């Protein structure tokens, strides 16, 4: 095919094949979003922030993001569900910590509520018990109060409520033969 005046003298190969960035803002936005989505799922806000950072015009960004939502390349609800599943089972995070992480990623409150509701209290408490059981041996040799503070603090950092953290840690210490009768309820 002969280069024509209409396409600026270029051959039929695309800019992407030549490694040139697209000149049209919509093409640029599309290329940026596809590249970002290739590595890992992203929320709409994460992609919008990336486009804004690269100075893509708002109209072009909105057009591409809306189209990607239409075809299912961006789905904040599915992202939130997968995030909760992964982070709860992988890191043992509680609903509160998961909701906080999703908020920072720009997921809407209603979608966060749906995603974290898949974890029930029993499941959350079982995960807390597993986390404490894994860390319990490392605290042997420390005095009882210090063990309680360390283990309950670890759970608190993972988003567990103070009440659940203290209950789970006390139970684990009792099962190990520690006297927890005189431990106060005033927190850690």
UniProtKB/Swiss-Prot annotation:
Cellular component per GO, a single term: cytoplasm
Cytoplasm found in the keyword field: yes
Location(s) in or outside the cell: Cytoplasm
Keyword Cytoplasm (UniProt): yes
Gene3D superfamilies: Winged helix-like DNA-binding domain superfamily/Winged helix DNA-binding domain
Pfam family, one: RecX_HTH1
GO biological processes: regulation of DNA repair
InterPro entries per UniProt: RecX_HTH_1st, RecX_HTH_2nd, RecX_HTH_3rd, Regulatory_RecX, WH-like_DNA-bd_sf
Domain of life: Bacteria
Alphabetical UniProt keywords: Cytoplasm
Basic and acidic residues composition bias: residue spans: 15-27
Segments of this protein annotated with the region Disordered: 1-28
Function: Modulates RecA activity.
Family annotation (HAMAP family): RecX
Family to which the UniProt record says this protein belongs: Belongs to the RecX family.
Name under which the protein is recorded: Regulatory protein RecX
Originating species: Streptomyces lividans
